Amino acid sequence: MFEKLEESSGNVIGFRLTGKLTDADYKAIGPEFEKAIENSGKIRLLWLLEDFKGWEAKAAWDDYEYWRKYGKNMEQVAIVGNKRWEDWMAKLAKLFLKGGVKYFDDSQLEDAWAWDRKGASE
């Protein structure tokens, strides 16, 4: 499940990801991406992974499609979690995203927000 975080503002959007993501989750989040891209052009994302279990099969394909569709508009992505495989997921995301991708331990949530708001190159 995706849950938009209230700290989101402007072109910096954060989501809590919990459980196993479904096709319905991706259908629900699409309008959020499109609205932010329409308003700002480029977006910066923060994924807060809490008890994240991965993707159902269709949702894994949706994830790939979203990176293809919206990747050019994603300026950078902060991934916050506490598992080694989540760090590897961040490294894999760098292959699909021209902007910055950085992994933060869950104890570094405020640092992740600051990095996203400031910009990877600043």
Model-derived regions: residue spans:
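Amphipathic, Lys/Arg-enriched alpha-helical "gate/interface" segment within cytosolic domains
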Residues: F2-E122
